[in-house]
Structure formats: structure tokens, C-alpha cells
Amino acid sequence: MSEMTPREIVSELDKHIIGQDNAKRSVAIALRNRWRRMQLNEELRHEVTPKNILMIGPTGVGKTEIARRLAKLANAPFIKVEATKFTEVGYVGKEVDSIIRDLTDAAVKMVRVQAIEKNRYRAEELAEERILDVLIPPAKNNWGQTEQQQEPSAARQAFRKKLREGQLDDKEIEIDLAAAPMGVEIMAPPGMEEMTSQLQSMFQNLGGQKQKARKLKIKDAMKLLIEEEAAKLVNPEELKQDAIDAVEQHGIVFIDEIDKICKRGESSGPDVSREGVQRDLLPLVEGCTVSTKHGMVKTDHILFIASGAFQIAKPSDLIPELQGRLPIRVELQALTTSDFERILTEPNASITVQYKALMATEGVNIEFTDSGIKRIAEAAWQVNESTENIGARRLHTVLERLMEEISYDASDLSGQNITIDADYVSKHLDALVADEDLSRFIL
């Protein structure tokens, strides 16, 4: 689990997301509180429940990007889901319980990777011995059994040295590796994913663990053998228990587009993909026990972060019980022209940096001037104001249109320097931006 302070988390988010300081502070505090809770004594720790967050803001201002970056920083089981994909229990579609099952699967995968990494040094030693056994087979007694030698032979030590120095990397050997499990694809209706995964596991285990001889270069064989030996050193039962503990104590669920499951206006009959989903989310957020293929998972201390644009619906349109379980409200601000300028230049992998790198592969050197950046930002903001406001996503549309000609002719422009300034941007975009009908369809 991440031990970063709130200030460090915000600083890391600042490298990728412009503005939205309130949202960054809220998620940073929530993440740090996970660590603080684990420092408490057992009795008090059980009483401290997470303060779930509701992020409200127009589309394209950074709600989903905060979730993506948070997943990398958290070093904890994390899953992002779309609220619109679920239906009420009893109807065709995914049930909300599958959120916890998917989160547990992600945790098992994460814990397995950590366990394999922890055992990598020992696995490398075992893989090395298996390759040496192929290169220099150990001596056998009269009954065909391998004799245990007190000291490795001089030849074995010489080959070990060559192996470690990479002198034997390109030599081909034939080695026995675990055969891939039998692949069985089972198609089932939505909502029955749990049953299909159990059937697949059953079929895969039918054949047992078989060995298959393969001819490989030593450097390729070494990678496969390390993975195989590391997997043998991992205890599956311990791994499952560690994964369940990680989900229960540190798990984070990000629910996007929650405004799309708000009930709109007066309607009769069951609303299975809106209010029904909200009712099903209640026990998860409040705390319940969900059955997964790895074991029972309690959701009492899982942190839920919900987000939505709320352009048509309002947060008060959520059912009152769910509103009460999302106590921290954070409003994200609409982006201005100066925000667009910063988005184009400040993030570590801004879209201007990406375009420059892509064109550099063809030998074309692109240079964006300050005046060019300013004009691109103004054009994006202008189109957002005159048509539909889609936030920072408009920059991708505008820049793609601006770079279209260069991207098409890049292979013929090798070795050239192209400067994108205000005049260049105006020449290529002004006519489109000014014509509202054209910008509505093209930008």
C-alpha cells in the first residue's frame, strides 16, 4: 500500500492533471487515511470506515484521469467501472456484485505479481540449475538415479560463469516446460460470468500439469523457467487470503458516470438500469459480504469514489440513502483558455510532446511556439463555447485537425523543421472555427 503523504500524492497528480486542486486534495486525503487507519489498534481500526467521495463536474475536466492516475499511485487493489453497465438483480445484465468479484480478481493478480517478484532471486537460481542440467547432465549411478554431488564439477562451474556473462544466450537447447493449460472458451448470457469462470477453471485442471519438450535459445528459456519456478514457490491458498485481505482493507472502487443512473422525471414501471442499480449499490457501499470464487469478501472498508457530469440530472436526484453514503462532495471547475494552454505544455506526456515524438520517428522536427499554443487553446475554447462543451477532449480534436497535413506528408518531409505558430494555426483552423456549422461536424 502507498505510504505517500497527501502533499506528495497531489504533487504526483500535478504532473498529469492541470487544475482541479480540490479534487486532488480530497482523493489524496482519502488515500492517506487508508494508511492512517492501518496504524491504529485492531479494535479502533474496525470502527473507522472510509469517507466515500462524489466528484461533480462537466465532461472533459479530469474526473476519469484522476482515477487512472490514482490507480497507479495507490499500490492497492483498484477497479474503475461504468455505472451504466449494470442492471438490477434478476434482470439480464451485469449485477453490481461483479464489481467486487472483478476487484478481487485484480487483487489476486497484483498479489501474485508481488509474490513472484519476491521469489525472483531464488527462481533465477533454480532456473539456472535446470539449464545447467541440460548442458551438463548430472552423473547417474548403476540404477539410473541422479547422484548427489558434494561439490559442483569444474565444467559445471565454467558453464555457470559463461551463462551469467551471457556468452551462451544464443545457444539452442531442448528443455521440458509446463504445457499451457487446456483452453476452453465458454459463451454464456450476461450476468453468468462467475459460472463460466468456474467451469473454465475446472476444465483447465482436468489435464493436470503436463510437461512439454521445447527447443529454445537459452536467453528465452531462462525467462520462461524463471516464471515457472517462481510460480512453484508461491502458495495459492496464502495468495488468495492475502488478496482478500488487500481488497477488504485497501480496496478502492471508482464508479464513473453515476449521474446516468439517476431517475429523470416521473416514470411508471420498474427502472432496472437506474434506480434499481442505485438500490443494489447501497449494501456494497454500506458494507456487506460478497461471494467470489476466491472466498467471501467484506466490503465494509472498501473506499468508493463516484463521479458524474450531472449536466441533466443533479446529485439530489440520487436516492437519499446513496447520497448519505457519499458524504464528501467535490466540484470540479470548467476549464478556461489558460487551463488549455497549460494542458498543452505542462504535463509530462502532453499531447504536443506526443505529436513531436511521433513526427520525430519520420525525421520531422516539430516546434510549437507560445503564440501557436495560445491560438490552439483559444480555438478549442471557442468551439466548446459555440457547440458542445467537451472540455479538454476538444484539444485532441483540434490538434488532430491541425496536424493532419503534416502527418499525411511526414514521410516526404524528413529532415525538415516545421514551426507551428499563431499564423500557422490561424491559416489551418480559423475558417473551421468561424463557421459554426462546419465546426459542429468537423471539430
UniProtKB/Swiss-Prot annotation:
Domain of life the protein comes from: Bacteria
Effect of residue 288 to V: No ATP hydrolysis activity. Binds ATP with lower affinity than wild-type. Can support HslV-mediated proteolysis to some extent
Locations listed in the record: Cytoplasm
Effect of mutating residue 393 to A: Complete loss of activity
Coiled coil location: none
Function noted in UniProt: ATPase subunit of a proteasome-like degradation complex; this subunit has chaperone activity. The binding of ATP and its subsequent hydrolysis by HslU are essential for unfolding of protein substrates subsequently hydrolyzed by HslV. HslU recognizes the N-terminal part of its protein substrates and unfolds these before they are guided to HslV for hydrolysis.
Gene name linked to the record: hslU
Protein name: ATP-dependent protease ATPase subunit HslU
Source organism of this protein record: Escherichia coli (strain K12)
Keywords in alphabetical order: ATP-binding, Chaperone, Cytoplasm, Nucleotide-binding, Stress response
